[in-house]
Amino acid sequence: MVSLKPGEFLINKVNSSTEKILIQDRPDIEAPKRRQVHKEPAGYDGFLIYDDGGYEATEVELTLLYHGGRVDDPAAISTARNRIYKFFKFGQYEFKMTPYFDPEKVYLCILTEAPTFENKWYYNGAMVFKLKIKVQPYKYYVDTIDSWWNIPKAGWMRNPKMSDAKPLFRIIGNGDLDMTVGYKKMIFTGVEGNIYIDCEKYFVYRNNNGVITNANHKCKSKDFWHIPSEQSVQINWNGAISTVEMIPRWRDLL
């Protein structure tokens, strides 16, 4: 759990207080909607539900306070706004946020619109502004989204949370590997250095000093792994590989 004072939050592990930004009002966060289509075929009573198994992203509006420590200084407003844009990575890419009211979780967000400033000038050194962000449907436990866990050649892994997990695996070494998680087996051939298996994005790739290369052709499988909620699965692997690691990504719905 991260220690945060009321109003504070983390953006990519940087505390908002370092940029003099606080959450003024706790936001309303709606539960993610199931991605479904309802059809009413001719001659059929009622409707049919087509469900693709996923959830929609949720839009959230944040009301924030920036306190620059200066009193009624119009010349500083441009600098303050630029610092705010930079802190939230405006228009660039997804960022990780941990709010004070949910310090065990990481929210994956992107800023969808430019901030709206409620006042055009500083009032006692402060500005109030609003942000509209889009949040992924799942929030992740802080100690399971970045840390690699070593996986022995034979053992059990329990998912203690109420949502299924789709981990990220990393295979280190050279050669071939057979690996089974639960009842699903994946076969890897010709591993050179490393291979990553992203079970959320359904993607197998190699990472060579930050250069990502598609490696789906090195994997044989009917499906990607997942670890069911509140259940244990057996994990076994064998082959010429030296190390297998996992970022478990325990998660809950928003």
Predicted regions located by residue number:
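Short beta-strand and beta-hairpin "edge-sheet" elements
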Residues: 30, 96-140
